């Protein structure tokens, strides 16, 4: 039987009984079912008995074990209580121990302080006693003249004195000790000088040790500097008393200094802790003690050279100095990190310092030099052809002078003199343009372009025009080379002075300028020989201007700048003057003939047979000589203007496109000549002819009817010439022709739509009512 179901939570008696009967015999009768039920009852009774028995045993065991558990719990409670009492006692012991220990440590600290004070007092007493002992013995020690023993005594006294700072007579003891050190120094000085002079390493080491112990190392170095400085100064004196030129004297001095650097560095490395700094200071002191001084020698030599050669001589001297500086830089460079950079900067200043006054006024010196040299370039000669030739040759000379000035600026100022250079170049170009202008005026006079003889014969002479074309080509070469030079100048300025421009610089901002200086100071150590900058401190305004120039060149690019804008403008004006000269040389002959028009008496005087020809048609009249000469001259212009078309000259082409001709086309006119420079010139001369012709016609006071027809015939002839050349006659000339041809009774009708003043003037000439 399965009794486990009695333990289930959902146990149901009926279900269990039904299930038990279903599991019994299937084919039994009612009697068997009763038997099966009796069996089940019996089994249940047996099972109940077993359960009761098991419960009884379990209860009995529980009752037996209960006193033991209670006793264990009671014992555990007693042990816990005892443990609590013990922990309280331990806590109190710890607290008491802490209090006792704290008091003990405080006592120990106080005892230690007392001990330290007692030791300090004892040491002070010992040192005081030692000072007294040493002070008493020092005189006897000095009598021995044993420098090592004396030094040891003084070192002991010095150490004792350090313990006696708070004593009342401390200052007196300091004075006494310094006096004793002075006596030792005086006693040792002959031996020191002998050791340094003979370059005795062992003896020098002894003195270095002694003077280090008594804190007198600067005084020992002073002996060292004095010994070797005397030798170098004596060398300079010998050089100055010789007959050698200054550049040779400088070479001798610099060779001696460079030799001293190498020998003394090698020796000082064995003696001093900082040998490179010691030898650097030796050179600084030597350069500063030269008699006569280098600035004085340079000034005297430059003054003797005179204005013409002062800059040349100065650069020769500077080359010698720069060569020496390069030698020193190469000597210092391998050990630059071992050097005191402050002292190296002082050495750089000492080497280049004598040139600073000249570098600061470099711009003025360069300007004077360039003006003297450009004044020596001849531009005017007796003959026009020679003058034109000199103008052509002068271009190369001009830009040769300018390029040489740029080289001098880069070499002498390392680009820092750029502002002065630009001013000097501006003056150079201005002076050259002035000379060139004077030469053009001279050529005008020699060609008699401004003085036209009233009765001179009409002669064609194209020499002046051909010379003018060569001058225009020269102007084109000037403009071309000026553009190239300006580009080269910008690149050179950036390559030489660009290193001085800080990345943090902002233009026109003092704060940004100062920030850039601070940034430069905070930047990693650089080579002082390459960073020498005389301008920033001595002329900050010019330095700020230089920074703006460099910033502009860097930001906008070296091809987009206006370094020589004023000079370019002046050269463009020069080109314009050359154009005017060429134009006047062509137009002179035409103007000469046109000026005769208003002076002719035939306009208002009745000629022989005039009454017979009044009614003749206009075609029976022929143009007068003056207009025929002009017409033939204009017809020959294309042949003589042909060089503008056939000549392949880039400079001439540049000048022609840059120049502007007088008498530009009227508004509304067709401009076919603009595509060809020769046609452009032909059109300008033609318009000048027509305008001048109109002006002189309107100056005629009175014309007879016959003269009116003759004048109209002359105008028609000129208009036909213009048509033959493909040029457009001016409206004013056409209007005058129409007014001259109009019959008196039709004059008012013809003049409608024409300029009122023009119509009135022509009416007055003809005597027509208007």
UniProtKB/Swiss-Prot annotation:
This is Conserved oligomeric Golgi complex subunit 7. The gene is Cog7. Keywords: Golgi apparatus, Membrane, Protein transport, Transport. Belongs to the COG7 family. GO terms for biological process: intracellular protein transport. Required for normal Golgi function. It is found in: Golgi apparatus membrane. InterPro entries: COG7. GO terms for cellular component: Golgi apparatus; Golgi membrane; Golgi transport complex. It is a peripheral membrane protein. Component of the conserved oligomeric Golgi complex which is composed of eight different subunits and is required for normal Golgi morphology and localization. Its main location: Golgi. Transmembrane segments: none annotated. The keyword DNA-binding does not apply. It comes from Mus musculus. The keyword Chaperone does not apply.
